[in-house]
Swiss-Prot record:
Protein name, entry field: Small ribosomal subunit protein uS5
A GO MF term: rRNA binding
Keywords assigned by UniProt, alphabetized: Ribonucleoprotein, Ribosomal protein, RNA-binding, rRNA-binding
Bias (Basic and acidic residues): 172-189
Signal sequence annotation: none
PROSITE patterns in UniProt: RIBOSOMAL_S5, S5_DSRBD
Lineage of producing organism: Bacteria, Pseudomonadati, Pseudomonadota, Alphaproteobacteria, Acetobacterales
Region (Disordered): 164-189
HAMAP family: Ribosomal_uS5_B
Family: Belongs to the universal ribosomal protein uS5 family.
PANTHER family to which the protein is assigned, alphabetical: MITOCHONDRIAL RIBOSOMAL PROTEIN S5
């Protein structure tokens, strides 16, 4: 009697076959130890960020006795937990946002064209895999890579496009920004 695969397992494979070229970045790898009666058992923990460079990103952590296996587990978990982030002009965020996770606190700001990715370490990996080209980011809290990545993804999950905000409020996109002000003419001296 063969067991039926649980729901959700099949979708994972289909999504990878759809032609979504996922790129993954290894953020950190760490040797960890479990203390047992006979001494210490060493293993490796990996943190990986995965994205399609078109607005989808996810992160995952994996642990195993060998490094490649830990990276594989982390990559699988990252693919399962991907989120979609709306991007302005396909290159930056729609608005400034803050994200927190544990002691990790990050501030993300939209940037004009040509700025590039101004972000440190783990945050840079998230933006590169996400496909954002212009952003300014600052980590104010913990420097722990896990907390920085989780805070960054938490901030990105709050990002909303003007169209989605307008539909949620039952308004038109033009109503969100209000009437345009005419530029004040300089006074003659």
């Amino acid at each position: 009697m063969a067991r039926e695969p649980r729901e959700g397992r099949g979708r994972e494979r289909e999504r990878d076959r759809d032609g979504d070229e996922l790129i993954d970045k290894l953020v950190t790898i760490n040797r960890v130890a479990k203390v047992v009666k006979g001494g210490r058992r060493f293993a490796f923990a990996a943190l990986v960020v995965v994205g399609d460079q078109k607005g989808r990103v996810g992160f995952g952590a994996g642990k195993a006795k060998e490094v490649p296996e830990a990276i594989r587990k982390a990559t699988e978990r990252a693919k399962r937990g991907m989120i979609r982030v709306p991007m302005k002009e396909g290159r930056t965020l729609h608005h400034d946002i803050e994200g927190r996770f544990g002691a990790g606190h990050v501030v993300l700001r939209a940037a004009p064209p040509g700025t590039g990715i101004i972000a440190g370490g783990p945050m840079r990996a998230v933006f590169e895999t996400l496909g954002i080209g212009d952003v300014v980011a600052k980590s104010l809290g913990s420097r722990n890579p896990h907390n920085m990545v989780k805070a960054t993804v938490a901030a990105l999950s709050q990002c909303a496009s003007p169209r989605s905000v307008a539909s949620r409020r039952g308004k038109k996109v033009a109503d969100l920004f209000g009437p345009k002000r005419e530029k004040e003419a300089p006074a003659d001296v």
